[in-house]
C-alpha cells in the first residue's frame, strides 16, 4: 500500500512561559541578574533552570511590558549578549540562561562533518560592536549523531569547545538521528534589542 507521512507539532514545557503577556517593573538597580530571573520563575512550580551569566547588579530600571516571561527573559539576557536555551528532553520547564560551561560526555571527532560560515551574522555582529569576532570564530560544523543533546549544550569537538546552536531530528531506519549545528561561543553571541512597545508609554 501507499506510505503515509505523519506530521506532528510539539512544544516543550517552556511554552507555559510564552502564553500570558505581563507588565511589571524591577526598580532596584542593586538587584542581581540571578535574582531577577528567579523572581520571574517563582510562579512556575517544578521548573529547573541554570544561569550562566555573571550575577552583576542590573544597574537600572528594568521593565517587562506586554511581554510573556519567555520573551522578557530573552530580551533581558540579550543585554549580556546571551540567550535562553530550552531543554526539550524534560517534561517540566527546564532551560539554561547562557551557554553551558560543562561539556557533554560524547566524542564526535570521528563523525563526518560539513563546514560552513554564516557571513550575514558575522557582518551583523562586527558592525554592532563585536569587532573582535574572527572568521574562525564564526565557523560552523554540522554533524549527525544518534546521541541526544540539547540546544546550548557544550561538546568538545576536535579538541575545542563547541556549542549546539540548532538541531534537526529525523527517523532513520527506525532510529532517532540528530543533525547538529555547532558554533564557537563567540559566534553565538546575540545583540541587545529592545521592546519597541515601551516607546512613549508612561510608567507609573
Language-model features and meaning:
Residues 1-204:
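Amphipathic alpha-helical and helix-coil boundary elements used as assembly
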